[in-house]
């Protein structure tokens, strides 16, 4: 039974029990009896004056096999004083902090229970059999398992001496004597029972060249090597390997070949089996460094998958009798190591893959979100997990069935009582969604413990949220480990000695990036999925919801949360609604993109688990596939100093870090701006990389070739040919690989050039690659098999059901991703298996293909008759004007062909035939060109920057931001209007084309084409609106993100920092880090100049202040001197020089302040900014000369003068009006003459 949201009444007239409306009676002396809660709704939150001494929670006895909390009678009590609703306002800041002796409590629907008590009824759903050593299996529970689905794989080491009580069969004891690695498959049965299958007998191993080992170590038999290895471990620092013996190793002699170079031949190697991954890692890094190790970094899970053909990391398995008809052994509940319903011991021969089953069992998805609040003196500061006073106040959890996508439960954990708004409850009911269960708690520890207990007892297999990896999980885990000293190793699927950890893996745009590893819980952060799949100007959850879901959340600013939280249960319910709706939106995003399907498809293909697929990058995917194939072909892969090791190895602990949401902690970063708003061209120049290989050889290679664009505006059709899967097809066509490469001419001297091998010069060095009939490329085999698999999957989609089609589409997309990773895999100098010669050859061949295509097109179809000879249908697609065909741009795998004298519709129909013709004439299969699109109009600006309209009228934009998040709305709208006019108004298009055909300098001495009048009219109207006194200032608001503390900026001359300090000086609320700061640029007035002087002094005070949070001074400092040493233009005459012209960044102002005070905008700045944005886009019309472009665009705007406000007032008093747009030069001259007389 679950209680739903509602009032405090309880059934049967029982007094309602609620949290955060009071606590207990006043503090009793130590040892006295605690009084019961009053039988009414509590309105005060008692400060227990809890004793600062006391014992930690009871340690678990040696017989207990779990480290999660199953009992607790004392804990650290931290709760906000703002919950003391009857206390005076001055006593409702800060937190209560002490220790409390009682069991943790939870309140729901007027009822009260112990958090850790497990009974027949509970406040949240549970899926568990064992808790705290007690068996809660329902009556009639059948533990039989035949078929089960695996979603996660764990590995750990067991020792025979510690497992004697587990009643293992003899064959399993042999596998762990003296120690052995155990693989645990976690999954679900078709009936919904959670299962853990422990597979014994998997051994990790590595290779060493036998001749080198025998020479260096004087080994005469494999046992001698085992003795040397054991001795090396015993001599290692620390006590970890002190008792290790030669029995921990087995060695055998095998024949293998190094995968590098064609001339390498099979030779004898020692294959050394090691019973511990830690011992293996130490040996590969430290044992006899002069001897190269092979495949020592491969973890036990990968060995288990690759050494058992057909095994998968995500899919259905069947238990069967093994060798000698030996069955799998059910584990007794007393020996369970996980929170599963059933556990089995087996060996690999007890398992068979059920390939025909492709549906998913009833896995559970938890979508969660947390709300936090600072609890110190400044409740608007950004919360930091390491501070005891900064609290998690609410957690929303939405629980879905992953197979049906049904939302089954909504939970809201609340610190303090919470009444969700009736409107929210009605909305959920009207949408057919379950009523929320509100769980209330007296302290943060109780709430967090309840949340983790729920996670343990419910055990969702998949977890999602928005930026949970960078904020929510780190904050919660840091609170539990640092503040409350709670061990987390038992809160995943493992009951103890598991992993539940988050750590940093780097930083991007000042936003930390993290990994999470939880046994039996796959975390898929939708923030990462969205940033990868969708291109948006902002990745805040609200912006994503509007763009992707066409939905919008009810917004609540972080700075409003403290006031709402302190205002009672009803207002806390508003926060709760906000928290729940965030999780609802993320759930919708999850089921729109279905990331688990694509990730699981990649995991199956690559032979790695889903967590590694998410966090370990592209290289690991190709490496495992190559490792599998190399083993089948008799090759071994050299070690690269442990770079293959996975998440299970130790990683440094990490504190919680601020997530990237500006308005509150929680919505993802998404708005990383450059500090300076500049539009630099991406010149796309090739850069040469020089890499050093292990043997001291050097290889340099250029990036992909880009044919310089013929910039301009093209109104004749432009056909774009695209190389299909360019780099994979080059590898296949030319048989490129580690194993087919040779650097020595003598190695291929017995072969025939061109027929048996390819000779190519790369970076000034000759390379040789043998053809497939001599030795087939491993990379080529992988690509061929993958692409054949993808083709077969795609062919099944049209005949599939909608559900099957989605799954198949995700599978083919996963294969495409892995195929495209192969080139990059070879080209990373410090990668898992680098071969820069292969990467350099791929790009060299790609450049040659572009050049060959250009030469062929220019020669083959230079005349229309030549085109007609190849394509007779071209006779019907002739257009007025002279004929020509030339390539105007080539970009890595695309070629732009300008076709004059031909119709666009005809080229669309004939494009594929042209592409096929070029492919047959120039390239080896499977390399082929495809006709990707045909532009009817194309503005080609620079490399990787163009705007065009394809047949059908759709506009395509690449590399050009028409709508930039750090431009104001007015400039974005005007820029878009100009582009639409250029492409969709034929008169303007024709005039622009004529403009682009002539040198830009010519137009400086002659009028612009008349057809551009409409274009100019938009600029004139924009100028009029900018100078209109009735303009809407909101249209001119710019924004920039406060990416870090103002003191951390190297460049202090930034507009948004100016506004930050102005707000600080005015004692207004300053923005938090990651907030986007709005601002406008105002005119330079006396008030602005004085403010700038004061700000300079305030910046100096803030820079010298300790701590991270600035505090406004008690009184504004007086400026040391004015920003000018002479009178301003508004002062009476007599000054000798003009005032200093302020920087644009100094003219930034808070929009609200500007509106309230009537501060005038800097119209010259905004128009210059508009011209600058237009110049970036339209400079291609003027030979990419930005200076000439701006000069010519200004022609549309008559010269005007914008006096300062006080000067303008004196002119108005004298009867003058503005000389706006449209005034003639003579009228302007006469008015200015009279004005000079007036002002003199």
Swiss-Prot record:
Alphabetical list of InterPro entries matching this protein: DNA-dir_DNA_pol_B, DNA-dir_DNA_pol_B_CS, DNA-dir_DNA_pol_B_exonuc, DNA-dir_DNA_pol_B_multi_dom, DNA/RNA_pol_sf, DNA_pol_B_thumb, DNA_pol_palm_dom_sf, DNA_pol_type-B
Domain of life: Viruses
Gene3D superfamilies found in the cross-reference section: DNA polymerase family B, C-terminal domain, DNA Polymerase, chain B, domain 1, Helix hairpin bin, Palm domain of DNA polymerase, Ribonuclease H-like superfamily/Ribonuclease H
UniProt biased composition (Low complexity): 1-22
Keywords: DNA replication, DNA-binding, DNA-directed DNA polymerase, Endonuclease, Host nucleus, Hydrolase, Multifunctional enzyme, Nuclease, Nucleotidyltransferase, Transferase, Viral DNA replication
Pfam families xref list: DNA_pol_B, DNA_pol_B_exo1, DNAPolymera_Pol
Single Gene Ontology MF annotation: DNA binding
Cysteines paired by S-S bonds: none
Reaction(s) catalysed by this chain's protein: DNA(n) + a 2'-deoxyribonucleoside 5'-triphosphate = DNA(n+1) + diphosphate; Endonucleolytic cleavage to 5'-phosphomonoester
Compositional bias annotation for Acidic residues: 669-688
UniProt key word Nucleotidyltransferase: yes
Protein name listed in UniProt: DNA polymerase catalytic subunit
Subunit structure and binding partners: Forms a complex with the ssDNA-binding protein UL29, the DNA polymerase processivity factor, and the alkaline exonuclease. Interacts with the putative helicase-primase complex subunit UL8; this interaction may coordinate leading and lagging strand DNA synthesis at the replication fork.
Protein localization: Host nucleus
Family named by the database record: Belongs to the DNA polymerase type-B family.
Keyword Transferase: yes
Listed GO biological process terms: DNA-templated DNA replication; viral DNA genome replication
Residue segments, region Disordered: 1-44, 646-695, 1103-1139
GO cellular component terms, semicolon-separated: host cell nucleus
E.C. no: 2.7.7.7, 3.1.26.4
